[in-house]
């Protein structure tokens, strides 16, 4: 009798487990179909949005060029109004690593398309939520309001003629609303502002290469070429910053960061450490021809410091609250 009860209990548990598995498979299949049915049209919508914002950017750049030419005070700012707790003289005499900037991340972003918003707030809510749903003013307006450090994402995007373009998008699939779709035009926007504000604190632009190792040597060649072409002598390259030093280990050991006074009206590009970092280093291991300085992740410094630290102008500390002792 006892054995019969045990056998019956096992069968019931087995039956229940099969039902649970069946419900899980059914639920996951339904979830997958819902996501798929929304994902495909959303990518199409995102592509159209990218083209719309590309055209918008062309018009905006034309507007800026006309405005700068017509009005000598257009986008001209007074740095003193953005400096708190110190005088302009104090800030200019400080070393670059002794001051803090107001900064924005994904500085080109202007929200989500309707389809992407549905996915992020609905089927993808557990993974994405509202963290990517925000809108910035244009980069020029941010600079006018005192932002002195911005972040741009660089995507290598294939073109119909077999070539490629560098575009500034958070995601070419889903997040394509950008005020700087054409990366070079976005750089031109920044350069026009610097031309109008030659006494500005040095601008810092963090560049994040998207696509992992797909952002390859030819993409970096194109990106560096843009930076040299657009900014010329205003661009603070590793070679310029290092001066007599051979590497940034020695540079940092001597606290050789230049004063803000010597960097007025200049711009520093920082390459955010990603999977393509080794590619960028390999193309110029002596840092003599690169346009961008390298910003290492703090975790990399801790794990692979000996290999990479000599290339690092600075370090990025994400989740800063966990590393208060390092700030």
Please describe what each predicted stretch is.
Residues 2-4:
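N-terminal acidic, proline/glycine-rich, low-complexity intrinsically disordered segments
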């Amino acid at each position: 009798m006892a054995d019969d009860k045990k056998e019956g209990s096992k069968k019931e548990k087995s039956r229940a487990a099969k039902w649970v598995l069946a419900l899980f498979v059914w639920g996951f299949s339904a979830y997958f179909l819902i996501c798929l049915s929304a994902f495909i049209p959303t990518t199409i919508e995102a592509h159209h949005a990218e083209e719309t914002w590309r055209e918008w950017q062309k018009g905006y750049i034309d507007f800026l060029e006309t405005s700068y030419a017509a009005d000598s005070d257009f986008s001209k700012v007074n740095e003193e109004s953005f400096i708190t707790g110190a005088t302009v003289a104090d800030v200019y005499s400080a070393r670059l690593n002794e001051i803090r900037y107001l900064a924005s991340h994904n500085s080109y972003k202007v929200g989500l398309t309707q389809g992407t918003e549905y996915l992020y707030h609905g089927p993808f809510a557990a993974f994405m939520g509202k963290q990517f749903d925000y809108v910035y003013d244009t980069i020029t307006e941010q600079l006018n309001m005192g932002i002195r450090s911005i972040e741009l994402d660089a995507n290598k995007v294939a073109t119909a003629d077999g070539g490629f373009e560098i575009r500034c998008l958070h995601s070419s699939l889903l997040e394509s609303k950008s005020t700087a779709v054409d990366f070079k035009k976005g750089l031109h926007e920044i350069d026009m502002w610097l031309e109008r504000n030659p006494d500005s604190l040095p601008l810092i632009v963090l560049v994040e290469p998207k696509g992992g190792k797909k952002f390859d040597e030819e993409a970096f060649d194109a990106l560096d070429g843009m930076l040299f072409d657009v900014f010329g002598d205003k661009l603070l390259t590793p070679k310029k910053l290092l001066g007599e030093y051979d590497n940034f280990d020695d540079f940092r050991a001597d606290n050789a960061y230049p004063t803000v006074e010597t960097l007025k009206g200049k711009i520093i590009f920082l390459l955010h450490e990603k999977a393509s970092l080794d590619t960028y280093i390999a193309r110029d291991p002596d840092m003599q021809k690169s346009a961008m300085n390298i910003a290492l992740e703090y975790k990399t410094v801790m794990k692979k410091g000996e290999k990479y630290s000599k290339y690092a102008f600075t370090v990025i500390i994400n989740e800063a609250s966990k590393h208060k002792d390092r700030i």
